[in-house]
């Protein structure tokens, strides 16, 4: 089962050790998923904050896939 994180700071720490990050855009929410060796972590972000969050995630993630 995926682990949903509520804190962006906590998610950034996970992204640093993630193998792959994925961005899935919906109508009301943008989901950012970070796959580590053991778990899949998700963070839900409103579309208004998407740009600032993705900017930080792109800097730390090794492999970013946009769906």
From Swiss-Prot:
InterPro entries: Ribosomal_eL38, Ribosomal_eL38_sf. Keywords: Ribonucleoprotein, Ribosomal protein. GO terms for cellular component: ribonucleoprotein complex; ribosome. One of its GO terms (molecular function) is structural constituent of ribosome. It comes from the Archaea. Signal peptide: none annotated. Belongs to the eukaryotic ribosomal protein eL38 family. This is Large ribosomal subunit protein eL38. It comes from Aeropyrum pernix (strain ATCC 700893 / DSM 11879 / JCM 9820 / NBRC 100138 / K1).
């Amino acid at each position: 089962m995926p682990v949903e994180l509520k804190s962006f700071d906590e998610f950034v720490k996970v992204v640093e050790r993630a193998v792959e990050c994925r961005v899935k855009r919906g109508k009301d929410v943008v989901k950012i998923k970070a796959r580590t060796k053991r778990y899949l972590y998700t963070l839900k972000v409103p579309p208004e904050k998407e740009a600032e969050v993705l900017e930080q995630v792109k800097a730390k993630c090794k492999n970013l896939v946009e769906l």
